[in-house]
Amino acid sequence: MCTMKKVTLPDEPVLEQRKDRTIEKIKDMTLKRTIARSILENLHDWFGIDESREQYIRECSDWMFFAVRENGHYAGFLCLKETGRQTVELAVMGVLRAYHRKGLGKALFHEAKKAAAKEGYSFMQVKTVKMGVYEDYDITNRFYLSLGFAEFEVIEELWGKENPCQIYVMSLK
């Protein structure tokens, strides 16, 4: 079992640090976009639509942004955006495929969840393509369920009938 220690650095706060892994809350807008681009451009199965990917990259600079470094290289990130006074949305998340199933996404999520609760939010939501439509998104759905999200609603028309939108929610209290 790895022991983790909390540390703070002057530029970007480090939320979790292990020998080979660091999770940081990123504040610099340019760095946010650089990390997002480097990750999302390598996840075409989920972010293959150029217009949508570019929108995430632009907008992520305005959101709470968490990044994980593995062996000194950025391997994933997660963004939270406020959708109401008490609610944040896990707006976009990406972990390079080579790092899937190694705990990076789960570690990122838990740090983001703690930060959202500390900021006073009561709920978190996330949207994805409904289970059973695409195999890659089935993996995503199972990941969100494993984190403790609960099914809330499916909106068939939000992204078009071929991409029904599943909304998951969780309490942060």
What does each model-found stretch correspond to?
Residues 2-51:
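Short amphipathic alpha-helix that is part of the acyltransferase structural core
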Residues 67, 73-81, 87-94:
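Conserved beta-strand in the GNAT
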Residues 82-91, 100, 119-122, 164:
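A conserved beta-turn-beta hairpin within the catalytic core of GNAT-like acetyltransferases
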Residues 93-101, 129-132:
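A short, internal acetyl-CoA/4′-phosphopantetheine-binding micro-motif in the GNAT/acyltransferase core
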Residues 101-114, 118, 142:
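Conserved acetyl-CoA-binding loop-helix of GNAT-fold acetyltransferases
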Residues 116-135:
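Conserved GNAT acetyl-CoA-binding A-motif
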Residues 135-140, 154-164:
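Short glycine/proline-centered loop/turn elements that form peptide/ligand docking sites
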Residues 144, 149:
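Conserved active-site tyrosine of GNAT-family acetyltransferases
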